[in-house]
Amino acid sequence: GVLMLYYPEEYNYKRDYLIKNDIDNLENTSLKINERIREFIIKKGRPVHKNELKQEFRGFSDIMLLYPILADPYLFKWEYNYYSCKDLLHFDENDINLLRKIIENIMNDNRGYCSDTMLYNSTLKNKCSFLEKNNIKSPMNLFYVANHLFYDEYDFRRPHICKKGIFENISVKNIALYLLNNPEEFSYQEYSKIVDKMKWSIVTSGMVLSNLEEEYYRNSKDK
């Protein structure tokens, strides 16, 4: 606030940081950060934790590091607070086509829907070699890789992968109602079958059921 009062024209003021106006603008500065983050990850040869980035790029806030990662097509999340880059991936066309085919098969069986756990379990079942080649050890890892590879083919919001345009707002509640065919009434048993099939967590399914009860009322023990 004091700097803005005395030097209103010398800096570009943002909520968490400022940039001197006689150097590159935010976009160009972010591009340089992108490249530096990418080079750092390549040098490490593995996904890196947010704290490693903050140690390497001292003085940068979380938002200053996250913005370039989200904006750069070569950078992506790996899991909670971990980030990776395209250069570390080992996918050939056969791998990409196989992963796409698995997603499509799951969606064909579930009206255009696939969860990260459904996808991961299916790749394990098919003994896909790209899991080991890319050190993919969890549904979250695979979700972010799929998001990176197919961001323009499907809609992603973890843990959900959906056919483009099916949902205006991707949420477990909307997906559950869609898979239940937007019924006037439904039973807890029907809902539980959806939860089990989609491999949603107990916490998620409980929260969604609570939200659904705001729009539906109980008329029996199971409905």
Language-model-derived ranges and their functions:
Residues G1-K223:
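C-terminal non-catalytic scaffold/interaction domains in large multidomain proteins
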